[in-house]
Curated annotation (Swiss-Prot):
Pathway: Plant hormone biosynthesis; gibberellin biosynthesis. Its cofactor is heme. It is a single-pass membrane protein. This is Ent-kaurenoic acid oxidase 2. GO terms for cellular component: endoplasmic reticulum; endoplasmic reticulum membrane. The gene is KAO2. Widely expressed. Highly expressed in influorescence stem, influorescence, and silique tissue. Weakly expressed in cauline and rosette leaves. Expressed at a weaker level in stem and influorescence than AtKAO1/CYP88A3. InterPro entries: Cyt_P450, Cyt_P450_B, Cyt_P450_CS, Cyt_P450_sf. It is an enzyme of class 1 (oxidoreductase). The chain crosses the membrane at residues 5-25. It is found in: Endoplasmic reticulum membrane.
Length: 489
């Protein structure tokens, strides 16, 4: 038989073999996770569990790394219809993706049916004693302790002066530096604020070293948990070790100062964490304090820095919106007594600027998803979410739903005029008992920065068409290279 004849004979068999191999591989996760469910398997949401080990992560990463993040959920809608609930295999676990306001609201607010369910790989980075790793009762207790000093009206009134001074100093400095990475400097600014609130620290050296490690940590939070050199997760674990060591040194020093009755001028959050006792008189140990610090300092600067950048450049790209926001700030200043500083009352008069911030939160959707886990079999929309399965609330799909927000990709702050979103339709800070405890502080920081920026500065991007990266968070690939120019003395 000729060589051509052999090829023609074997070619169909090879193709058939590949199809059989694909069929087998695509059913491995089904055999592992679905077969044992018995009759309940017939009530699972539509979807597929992807490939062995990697599940659906390849299609997820491909969508988010090719600047088309909506294509991931759209592929489910195309194949299975607009059910708003789909089964998948993500971050090493069988899971259910929920993509509508109703399903997201149910998952985030029903604490009897769901509890926090971050992947184990992520828990190793965030800390098992942080808010995402502790019991529901312990979470409520620590949230009560930490929310008021971070987010309460009295605390916000105290922080305004420091935030305003920091913003003015940094903007003036940036305007003399020529081309800068706008995002990188904003993250340092917001990190400076959260360090002051939690640790009373204004040390540039300490802040720079910690902020660099947080950058590495965040790249690993939503990466595949592969602990091998060269992978983002491996670098993130190393960053966590360095952060823990730094915070351990800070906590130890603070405890020693207190033993020696060396007190600072103000009581910060670290003092509160050291002082707190439960009903049995138990205090927090160092691991608990360090994990809480690590979590709060990360959440307290990452979102604020990114969202401030996006609000600034989105307004710069829409001159009419920028002008309207600027005129509002000018009216506020005009009513102010000579020599008076910005007040909390004035920030609450920034109605249009608040709409700009809300629209930025919606369009950008800084938090991709929240992780929950079913405590028992949960019925939802005629389907069953099996006990132990992860549930991912897909915020991006809610915020870009044209039935809720017409022309959803258009940056249009006026859509918020006289509009109160229904529960579950606007989720930038989550919902329910795990609502972000620093949401008001974040909006205050953004408002103060934009107030002074609009009055005295403008930004000119070096690469306006720079591609956007979507993991771990939305950002221009060049970290928004730009020049900050002062427009008035």
């Amino acid at each position: 038989m000729t060589e051509t004849g052999l090829i023609l004979m074997w070619f169909p068999l090879i193709i058939l073999g590949l199809f059989v191999l694909k069929w087998v591989l695509k059913r491995v996760n089904v055999w592992i996770y679905v077969s044992k469910l018995g009759e309940k398997k017939h009530y699972l949401p539509p979807g597929d569990l992807g490939w062995p080990v990697i599940g659906n992560m390849w299609s997820f990463l491909r969508a988010f790394k090719t600047s088309d993040p909506e294509s991931f959920i759209q592929s489910y809608i195309t194949r299975y219809g607009r059910t708003g609930i789909y089964k998948a295999h993500m971050f090493g676990y069988p899971c259910v993706l929920v993509t509508t306001p109703e399903t997201c609201r149910r998952v985030l607010t029903d604490d009897d049916a769901f509890h926090i369910g971050w992947p184990k790989s992520t828990m190793k980075l965030i800390g098992r004693k942080s808010f995402v790793g502790i019991s529901f009762e312990e979470h409520k207790r620590l949230r009560r302790l930490t929310s008021a000093p971070v987010n309460g009206p009295e605390a916000l009134s105290v922080y305004i002066q420091f935030i305003e001074e920091t913003v003015n100093t940094d903007l003036e400095k940036w305007s003399k530096m020529g081309e800068i990475e706008f995002l990188s400097h904003l993250r340092k600014l917001t990190f400076k604020v959260i360090m002051y609130i939690f640790l009373s620290s204004e040390s540039e050296h300490v802040m720079d070293s910690l902020e660099r490690e947080y950058t590495n940590l965040n790249y690993g939070v939503r990466a595949m948990g592969i602990n091998l050199p060269g992978f983002a997760y491996h670098r993130a674990l190393k960053a966590r070790k360095k952060l823990v060591a730094a915070f351990q040194s800070i906590v130890t020093n603070r405890r020693n100062q207190r033993k020696q009755n060396i007190s600072s001028n103000r009581k910060d959050m670290l003092d509160n964490l050291i002082d707190v006792k439960d009903e049995n008189g138990r205090v927090l140990d160092d691991e608990e304090i360090i994990d809480l610090l690590l979590m709060y300092l990360n959440a307290g600067h990452e979102s604020s820095g990114h969202l401030t950048m996006w609000a600034t450049i989105l307004m710069q790209e829409h001159p009419m919106i920028l002008q309207k926001a600027k005129e509002e700030q000018e009216r506020i200043v005009k009513k102010r007594a000579p020599g008076q500083k910005l007040t909390l009352k004035e920030t609450r008069e920034m109605v249009y600027l608040s709409q700009v911030i809300d629209e930025t939160l919606r369009v950008i959707t800084f938090s991709l998803t929240a992780f929950r886990e079913a405590k028992s079999d949960v019925q939802m929309d005629g389907y069953i979410i099996p006990k132990g399965w992860k549930v991912l609330t897909w915020f991006r799909n809610v915020h870009l739903d044209p039935e809720i927000y017409p022309d959803p990709k258009k940056f249009d702050p006026s859509r918020w005029e006289g509009y109160t979103p229904k529960a579950g339709t606007f989720l930038p800070f989550g919902l329910g008992s795990h609502l972000c405890p620093g949401n008001d502080l974040a909006k205050l920081e953004i408002s103060i920065f934009l107030h002074h920026f609009l009055l005295k500065y403008r930004v000119e991007r070096s690469n306006p068409g720079c591609p956007v990266m979507f993991l771990p968070h939305n950002r221009p690939k060049d970290n928004c290279l730009a020049r900050i120019t002062r427009t008035m003395p």
